[in-house]
Swiss-Prot record:
Catalytic function, reaction form: iminosuccinate + dihydroxyacetone phosphate = quinolinate + phosphate + 2 H2O + H(+)
Enzyme Commission number(s) of this protein: 2.5.1.72
Gene: nadA
Cofactor binding mode and count: Binds 1 [4Fe-4S] cluster per subunit.
Protein's organism: Shewanella sp. (strain ANA-3)
PANTHER family: QUINOLINATE SYNTHASE, CHLOROPLASTIC, QUINOLINATE SYNTHETASE A
Binding residues for [4Fe-4S] cluster: C116, C203, C300
Name of the molecule in the record: Quinolinate synthase
GO biological process per UniProt: 'de novo' NAD biosynthetic process from L-aspartate
Requisite cofactors: [4Fe-4S] cluster
Cross-referenced SUPFAM superfamilies: NadA-like (SSF142754)
Keyword annotations of the record: 4Fe-4S, Cytoplasm, Iron, Iron-sulfur, Metal-binding, Pyridine nucleotide biosynthesis, Transferase
Biological or metabolic pathway of the protein: Cofactor biosynthesis; NAD(+) biosynthesis; quinolinate from iminoaspartate: step 1/1
Annotated Gene Ontology cellular component terms: cytosol
Length: 357
């Protein structure tokens, strides 16, 4: 489905990429891990990590009784865990989602500078104006958005339940505004037939996957199944043997008979995917330039900021201003409404909501 003529035009945004963390020696890594484990106990804290963080961070979360999952499950785990402090290894909107669900807890992030192109590409002032121009539309936003954008929405969705919710709204004759990921929105529109006004954002990682290069790689590995996250361009999604959220792609690798998979999502997912499918071969899908001219090169630069040194600092720094997440209470209450609406809808379907990027 082509974008609505009323939707904002696609702008090429040159996102300011952060510098990569300085590599640590094995001895330094061991020291930081030991220190983090001790501080988690002392501070009554638990570490939750997103699928797209580096493998050693995911392993540390598991070793210390935390969790590795998508952003909504991270927030729910933190809400239900008895720890008073939640360390969120991910990007800023994930920390905000955790605070929305657990206002009484201290939410810390390794760095508040870890952001997301979907968040940056959907500033609340412009999104408000877009929604105000179409007051008869129901506003549906992806979970990969700021607390302010969530507060403006009627529904918040993850990629695992977006199809069902949009189908439900469409069956009721609702006109829909979708934001911010244009690729995911187009995929949902194609699957459901719903008419949607689409915000024109994208994920810098998934937007770089290229169908022509993927086709060439498939020729090299004809027996490989192609797994694609729906934040990818339509031409890439069209080549997929399985399309789904992070958790759904992990499940596909585990259950499909293929011994080899070409995976079109952030390579951070390989850690949990390999756990779920030991012995199977995982291959990165090609990005723009086959590594020569790609920008993200299949790994989110902001996720990469969640290093051991930064995690230790979030626990040890006496000044928490560069780590602690705050959400205005009025905004939090408003953002909680569409989140709760999604969770309640999921209960009626008897399904567990997982799977935003």
């Amino acid at each position: 489905m082509s974008p609505s003529p009323f939707a904002p035009t696609i702008e090429t945004i040159d996102y300011p990429f952060p510098p990569k963390p300085i590599p640590l020696s094995d001895a330094e890594k061991a020291d930081y891990k030991a220190r983090i484990k001790q501080l988690l106990i002392e501070k009554d804290a638990v570490l939750v990590a997103h699928y797209y963080t580096d493998p050693e961070i995911q392993a540390l979360a598991e070793e210390t009784g935390g969790c590795v999952s998508d952003s909504l499950e991270m927030a729910r785990f933190g809400r239900d865990h008895p720890a008073k402090t939640l360390i969120v290894a991910g990007v800023k909107f994930m920390g905000e989602t955790a605070k929305i669900l657990s206002p009484e807890k201290t939410i810390l992030m390794p760095t508040l500078e870890a952001t997301c192109s979907l968040d940056l590409g959907c500033p609340i002032d412009k999104f408000n104006a877009f929604c105000d121009a179409h007051p008869d539309h129901t506003v549906v936003v992806y979970a990969n958005t700021s607390a302010a954008v969530k507060a403006r929405a009627d529904w918040v969705v993850t990629s695992s339940i977006a199809l069902e919710i949009v189908e439900h709204l469409d069956s009721e004759g609702k006109k829909i505004i979708w934001g911010p990921d244009r690729h995911l929105g187009s995929y949902i529109a194609k699957q459901t037939g719903a008419e949607m006004l689409m915000w024109q954002g994208d994920c810098i990682v998934h937007d770089e996957f290229k169908a022509n290069a993927l086709r060439d790689l498939k020729r090299v590995y004809p027996d490989a199944a192609i797994l694609v996250h729906p934040e990818s361009p339509a031409s890439v999604v069209a080549m997929a043997d399985a399309v789904g959220s992070t958790s759904q792609l992990i499940k596909a690798a585990q259950t499909m008979a293929n011994e080899r998979f070409i995976v079109a999502t952030d390579r951070g997912i390989f850690y949990k995917m390999q756990q779920a499918a030991p012995g199977k071969t995982l291959i990165e899908a090609p990005t723009g330039g086959n590594g020569a001219t790609c920008k993200s090169c299949a790994h989110c630069p902001w996720m990469a900021m969640n290093g051991l040194k930064a995690i230790e600092a979030s626990l040890s720094d006496s000044d928490k201003t560069t780590h602690e997440i705050f959400v205005d209470e009025d905004l939090r209450v408003k953002a909680l409404i569409p989140l709760t609406r999604m969770l309640d809808f999921a209960k009626t379907l008897n399904m567990k909501v997982k799977g935003n990027a």
